[in-house]
């Protein structure tokens, strides 16, 4: 049994989110939530919400026992960037790209 949760367009870069995802890949659910709860990174809060959503999906849709679940796979994909302009000297402008990512969490036995 596999249960999936996806968060599309998360407002954080994929590179920063992968640092957190690598820490919980393959861990049991309880341990993964503890790691995320005590991580000081912004990405940990976002990833924790996606993991909790996957747990809720497992309970509601599959009737699964959450004590036996673990993080089977978690991967972060780059999403479209939000493009903004900022004013520079002498009438010029520079483009700023605000990065976004897609977070996919799969739970299984």
From Swiss-Prot:
Family annotation (Pfam families): Ribosomal_L22
Record CDD domains: Ribosomal_L22
GO CC terms of this entry: cytosolic large ribosomal subunit
Keywords recorded for this protein, A-Z: Ribonucleoprotein, Ribosomal protein, RNA-binding, rRNA-binding
InterPro entries xref list: Ribosomal_uL22 (IPR001063), Ribosomal_uL22_bac/chlpt-type (IPR005727), Ribosomal_uL22_bac/org-type (IPR047867), Ribosomal_uL22_CS (IPR018260), Ribosomal_uL22_sf (IPR036394)
Superkingdom of this protein's organism: Bacteria
Single GO term (MF): structural constituent of ribosome
Gene Ontology biological process terms in this record: translation
Protein family membership: Belongs to the universal ribosomal protein uL22 family.
Quaternary context: Part of the 50S ribosomal subunit.
Function recorded in the entry: This protein binds specifically to 23S rRNA; its binding is stimulated by other ribosomal proteins, e.g. L4, L17, and L20. It is important during the early stages of 50S assembly. It makes multiple contacts with different domains of the 23S rRNA in the assembled 50S subunit and ribosome.
Name of this chain's protein: Large ribosomal subunit protein uL22
């Amino acid at each position: 049994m596999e249960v999936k949760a996806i968060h599309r367009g998360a407002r954080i870069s994929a590179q920063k989110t992968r640092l957190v995802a690598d820490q919980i890949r393959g861990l049991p659910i309880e341990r993964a939530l503890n790691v995320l709860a005590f991580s000081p990174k912004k990405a940990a809060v976002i990833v924790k919400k996606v993991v909790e959503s996957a747990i809720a999906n497992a309970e509601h849709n599959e009737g699964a026992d959450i004590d036996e679940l673990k993080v089977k796979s978690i991967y972060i994909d780059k999403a479209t960037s939000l493009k903004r302009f900022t004013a520079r000297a002498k009438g010029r402008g520079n483009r700023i790209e605000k990065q976004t990512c897609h977070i996919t969490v799969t739970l299984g036995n």
